[in-house]
Every structure is written in structure tokens, then in C-alpha cells.
Amino acid sequence: MATIYYDKDANLDLLKKRKVAIIGYGSQGHAHALNLRDSGVDVRVGLAAGSKSKAKAEGAGLRVLSVAEASKEADVIMVLIPDQTQKKVYDEEIAPHLSKGKALLFAHGFNIHFVQVRPPPDVDVLLVAPKGPGHMVRRQYQDGRGIPGLVAVHQDATGQAKAVGLAYARGIGCTRAGVLETTFKEETETDLFGEQAVLCGGAAALVKNGFEVLVEAGYQPESAYFECLHELKLIVDLMYEGGLAWMRHSISDTAEYGDYTRGPRVVDGRSKDEMRKILKEIQGGHFAKEFILENQAGGPTMARYRAAEAAHPIEEVGKRLRDMMSWIREAKKDSSDPGSR
């Protein structure tokens, strides 16, 4: 069982004595910076020259510096930029300013676990990862609640790495809900597996195949969209609220019986075998190498996939149907704007 830490286990004063730099001001970056500031922490934001986020950060009352300047000033540096850009930014702008005793933090372990970022031995290296999108991290904090999170220590040079991580987690509100202790290896490998096999890759492929089967059988694309994509949220929300048992309790007997008797025919032993293969590719570093080389080449494979998927009929049908749903437009605008609340 995982060890879980709460507010009582975290000393926020430990962080208030230090200067914190948030590198990046996207979904997570804006939430971390604002929550830490509101918790009484000395925060600055490090952004690339010409960043479109500068005006938003300054508009929120935050001090904005270059990545190098922020890293030089800070004792605690949280890296919240995309995985594929972290190595270059780290090597050129953060590493030169990592003096002894500083703490380097990440919200995802990819670049540490797969040895793309190599911190010096005299700094703390740790992970603090809220298990929710940035706008939710911010809103829950503002409402006096918090998002569950993860904490992990890769390198404890000062003897205080975990304490710093817990203080940071408290500063952004995660210890209000509970923070689970993990490792960089576990966070990275399970996160990638979940994305590829279930949450993104698996779910998207299942939805698209279901849509195609119905359309190919002569049903209206609009009906196929509603049944295979739109209503997925209704089911996932039930799982989210109470697990599989609550979902099955909440649906019709017809749907429940079909779940038990037909679901395993769609996602069967062969699917599980492929999941095992995907996990081995992650554990062995094969996916990481493939992704790194893809980005070094300029992302040609990603570009082809994006173009092909954007042209799939489900996208055009979905756009037309979503235009009928005012609540979706409002929710999308709200969640995409860091300053919306």
C-alpha cells in the first residue's frame, strides 16, 4: 500500500524560506505559480524570450524573468515545460545555475528516468505531480480543497529532499487531499502505460473503431458519434465517481448484461498481451528512444498522424454536433484559459 501524506506531514515554512522558480506558465505552471504565491511563497516565473505567456503571468501579478535568470535566483526550481524541450532548456539555461544545495523538481519523471537530464550530485532532485489538470489544481485550491498528488525523491543531496517536496505539495494544495509517495520509475512507466494503452491510445482507438463499424453498417454518422464518443463521458464520470461497481449500478440492466457478456470479446486476452508488450517497450526504454529520435528529426511521424486523424470523419461530425451544445463551448473556454478564474 502507498504511503500517503497530508497537511500535518508537510512544513510549508521550509519552502517559505526559499526562492522558488516555476519554469513555464502553461496548464500546470500557472496553477503552481499562483497557488504558491497565495500560500506565501516567494515565486518567480521563468519563460523563454518572446513567450506569449509573459503577459498572462505579469497580468496575474507574477514576476517574470528569463529561464536562466529565474534559475539563478531560485533555490527551488520546478520544471513545467514539455518533455521534449526539457533537455535543451535544462542544459543551456538551468544547469549552469544549479549550485550546491538547490532543489530541482519535475511534475513528470520522463527526462530523469530516461537519463536525458543529468543533474549534478550535490542538488536535490524530486517529483511533485498533481493528479489533475492545472485549472482544477487552481480551482480546488481557491475553494479551500486540493487535488491528490504524487511525491518522489530521485536524489537527496541535502537530507531534506522529501521535506521540500512535501512543502511544495502543500503550497499548491495537494496535501489537503493527500500525496502518495512513489518513485520516478513508477510514476514515469505507469503514466506512459496509462496514456498509451488505456486513456489516450486505447480509448481513442476503441471509440474510432466503434464509430467506423456503425457507419460502415449504414447507420447515420451522427448516431454513431453519440453512441461511441459523446456518451463515453457519461460512463467515465460514473467510473470516476465510484469505480466500475458504481457505473454498473447506475446503468440499465440491459447495458450491464451487455458489459459482462460482450465487453471481454472486444478487449480480450490478445489486447492484454499487446498491453504487456507496450509496457515492456516502456520499461526497456524503447518508447523513450523512439520519441526522442522523433523529436530530434523534427516530428515527421507525429505530423503525419495528426494530419490523418484530423481528417477522420468523426472529427467533422463531432464539430457539428458539439456546436449544438452550449455547455461544451463554455466548459472548453473556461478550461483553456489559465486566467479564467
Swiss-Prot record:
Cofactor note: Binds 2 magnesium ions per subunit.
EC number of this enzyme: 1.1.1.86
Span of domain KARI N-terminal Rossmann: 1-182
Cofactor(s) recorded in Swiss-Prot or TrEMBL: Mg(2+)
Binding residues for NADP(+): Y25, G26, S27, Q28, S51, S53, D83, Q84, T85, Q86, G134
GO molecular function (one): NADP binding
Positions annotated to bind substrate: S252
Ligand binding (Mg(2+) 2): D191, E227, E231
Pathway info: Amino-acid biosynthesis; L-isoleucine biosynthesis; L-isoleucine from 2-oxobutanoate: step 2/4; Amino-acid biosynthesis; L-valine biosynthesis; L-valine from pyruvate: step 2/4
Start and end residues of each KARI C-terminal knotted domain: 183-328
Catalytic activity annotation: (2R)-2,3-dihydroxy-3-methylbutanoate + NADP(+) = (2S)-2-acetolactate + NADPH + H(+); (2R,3R)-2,3-dihydroxy-3-methylpentanoate + NADP(+) = (S)-2-ethyl-2-hydroxy-3-oxobutanoate + NADPH + H(+)
Sorted UniProt keywords: Amino-acid biosynthesis, Branched-chain amino acid biosynthesis, Magnesium, Metal-binding, NADP, Oxidoreductase
Pfam family, any one: KARI_C
Membrane-traversing stretches: none
Entry-linked InterPro entries: 6-PGluconate_DH-like_C_sf, KARI, KARI_C, KARI_N, KARI_prok, NAD(P)-bd_dom_sf
A GO CC annotation given for this chain: cytosol
Gene Ontology BP annotations: isoleucine biosynthetic process; L-valine biosynthetic process
CDD domains hit by this protein: Glyco_tranf_GTA_type (cd00761)
Active site: H108
Amino-acid positions noted as binding Mg(2+) 1 in the UniProt annotation, renumbered to this chain: D191, E195
Function according to Swiss-Prot or TrEMBL: Involved in the biosynthesis of branched-chain amino acids (BCAA). Catalyzes an alkyl-migration followed by a ketol-acid reduction of (S)-2-acetolactate (S2AL) to yield (R)-2,3-dihydroxy-isovalerate. In the isomerase reaction, S2AL is rearranged via a Mg-dependent methyl migration to produce 3-hydroxy-3-methyl-2-ketobutyrate (HMKB). In the reductase reaction, this 2-ketoacid undergoes a metal-dependent reduction by NADPH to yield (R)-2,3-dihydroxy-isovalerate.
Similarity comment: family membership: Belongs to the ketol-acid reductoisomerase family.
Xref: NCBIfam families: ilvC (TIGR00465), PRK05479.1 (NF004017), PRK13403.1 (NF009940)
Protein name, as recorded: Ketol-acid reductoisomerase (NADP(+))
